[in-house]
Amino acid sequence: MQERYIPKNVEGKWQEIWEENKTFTVTEDPSKPKYYLLEMFPYPSGRIHMGHVRNYSIGDVVGRFKRMRGFNVLHPMGWDAFGMPAENAAIKHGSHPAKWTYENIDYMRSQLKKMGLSYDWGRELATCDVDYYKWEQKMFLEMYEKGLVYKKSSFVNWCPACETVLANEQVEDGCCWRCDSDVTQKELDQWFFRITRYAEELLEDTWNLPGWPERVLVMQRNWIGKSFGCEIDFPVEGKVEKVKVFTTRQDTLYGATFMSLAPEHPQALELTTPERRAEVEAFIDKVKKTDKIKRTAEDFEKEGVFTGAYCINPVTNLRMPVYLANFVLLDYGTGAVMAVPTHDQRDFEFARTYDLPLQVVIQPEGETLDPAAMTAAYTEVGTMVNSGPFNGMKSDEAKEKIADYLEQEGVGTKTVNYRLRDWGISRQRYWGNPIPVINCDICGVVPVPDKDLPVVLPMDAEFTGEGGNPLARVESFVNVTCPQCGAEARRETDTMDTFVQSSWYFLRYCCPDFACGPIDRARAGYWMPVDQYIGGIEHAVLHLLYSRFFTKALRDLGYVTVAEPFKNLLTQGMVIKDGAKMSKSKGNVVDPDALIERYGADTARLFTLFAAPPEKDLDWSDQGVEGSFRFLNRVWRLVFEVLPFIGSAGKPDPAALGDGARDLRRTVHKTIRKVTDDLDERFHFNTAISAVMELVNAIQSFEPKNAPENAPVLREAVESVVQLLAPFVPHVAEELWESLGHQGGVEASGWPSYDPEATVEEELLIVVQVNGKLRGKVTVAVDAGEEQVKAAAFADDKVKPWLDGKQIRKAIYVPGKLLNIVVG
């Protein structure tokens, strides 16, 4: 064993051994409990960052710990490889997106291997590989046959910089989540997944995921947004048409004084009178350029335009002017809102701006609202007024009564509504999975036959930066023959949203070599669901919701038997430096390559695991990195120093141990218990590492180390340190384990078990209070009774001065913990 710890020598050696021996390659083994561990796979941007280091280190600790506990661990890695950055790089550097992507994958793979991550690299996949996306095309067509995929014209979020469509979830504060450009509205023919078919199941199953953070589940429930209410028909004055409204506040129907339509509403122009048309069209054009998220923000200025049309309130028969309003969205409810300005704040602000009438229909207890004097809408429960037969009722009770009345009168129906909308997956870009359909003027939309799959991306596309979809300019790709009628036709040039690829990759990891379909049902049946999934909170209503939908859809197609993909979810915190998330623009980036070159991967891993609990943000500290490096050097020197003394010592004989050796052994077994609990139940890596550090201190303080009778307990202590550190710092642990004379590797040795008897304290430390205030502590035998504890307390030099000259009225003893002496 070398006297000095040189990370580069140690880490290179063991990484080579792991690769040669295929140490982390796994197959299905029914004789072992399985454990499927997965971190969210990265986009191959070119370099890993410290967020990756932290995320993957967290996962690796779990994987190595579970292996040492006897689990058959699947821990794969791959690449979420489609997306706009590759096209942007192609324009900038004049190289093909595939070349840029695969070069990045090669480099990032080498970085991950240098971190010592225990991946089964034989299962590696990249979503841009034809062997991956061809199966996605097959599943797309099967979903199309089942009515889970359809095409329609719709207003979409459009990023003018990326020149592509964004899902609602990909718009952040009105900006593109990729490039931060302002998002506008554009009407396009789009392909959709019918995720709404699963809205109720997606919602209900959030209650069956106890291993998920509650805040993620709440975010998904809110996104799905189930609400109970009524659909009400409002006749249009002078026309046969009606405007259908969904509301959860039918108790306010008698106070509805005007109608607000989304500017995109299909009836918007139909209802507009000729003299109002120019102004209405100008307003619609203006709103189309505004992002939906901004439009619904509380502080966004409420604007509208009168259409010239009127609806009739079906219960009051009053005329209601019909407005288009910028805060009403087509994709919630019906896109039409019965406006009740006295009891809805947005309607109130709009009514004040456009001088529209107000009618109070709910009065608070003991108060009378005057519409003219109101400064804000009243939105709480109260007593019904100006509401015909419902006057005097509590408003929450009146909801059901009014719903029944509307159904009896044939003007409304009780309805359940969901905020969730179908998932638009069309993207106007090259570097994505081609949508496998053909557009024929005679036959319409024609699925590509199975025998013609996969539809492969052409390699001769040109990336000029001129805008638009490069795929649409490749004539050899676009111009095809209709497989049904033989006429000239055009291939679909939209590609799929990259979230489609990440919605099922965890299933393909179970069977990456399967050549008969996307998923081997038997192998997926062994591994699924993923037992522990690790990734960022930012994916709560994007990737995580889509993956849940895909799993349910594929279950119904017969590919899998599970209904949920991820049993447990850990959302790790960010890496912070100088008070902000690391980013190039802020100049606070730490380069993992430089860190590993200087300190080694084990130090990088140890610091990121020790500095904060996984779910919390980690504040970067150069001093903390130095401290982690010093600790590994201490452990190395400790093993080097005790090696001559422990030789081939066997297991300790508890009956033959002296007091000091017995104390050390107690510390060893208490530490094993502590670290096991921290890793197995809580993922408290920082407290587990802290416990091992305390054990190292105890070993260093233990004397005499060179006494033959102490060799067994010293060997047990040092070996336990190495085994307990193995999931955190695997290279150092393997090297030290080998130096201690073991063959087969520290991970193969299994996880150390603790002896409950060895953890029992022989003495107890009792806190002594006088009149409730701490005055001393006494040590007594573990089996000492109350009288012995009192005697020790009365004799203690720190306690006696507080008792002298005082009358002891009583003593209250909490066994094994505390003695409170009451004096007067």
From Swiss-Prot:
One of its GO terms (molecular function) is ATP binding. It comes from the Bacteria. ATP binds at residue 584. The keyword ATP-binding applies. It is found in: Cytoplasm. InterPro entries: aa-tRNA-synth_I_CS, aa-tRNA-synth_Ia, Leu-tRNA-ligase, Leu_tRNA-synth_edit, M/V/L/I-tRNA-synth_anticd-bd, Methionyl/Leucyl_tRNA_Synth, Rossmann-like_a/b/a_fold, tRNAsynth_Ia_anticodon-bd. CDD domains: Anticodon_Ia_Leu_BEm, LeuRS_core. A motif ('KMSKS' region) lies at residues 581-585. A motif ('HIGH' region) lies at residues 42-52. GO terms for biological process: leucyl-tRNA aminoacylation. GO terms for cellular component: cytosol. It holds the Pfam family Anticodon_1. It catalyses: tRNA(Leu) + L-leucine + ATP = L-leucyl-tRNA(Leu) + AMP + diphosphate. Keywords: Aminoacyl-tRNA synthetase, ATP-binding, Cytoplasm, Ligase, Nucleotide-binding, Protein biosynthesis. Its EC number is 6.1.1.4. HAMAP family: Leu_tRNA_synth_B. Belongs to the class-I aminoacyl-tRNA synthetase family. This is Leucine--tRNA ligase. It comes from Geobacter sulfurreducens (strain ATCC 51573 / DSM 12127 / PCA).
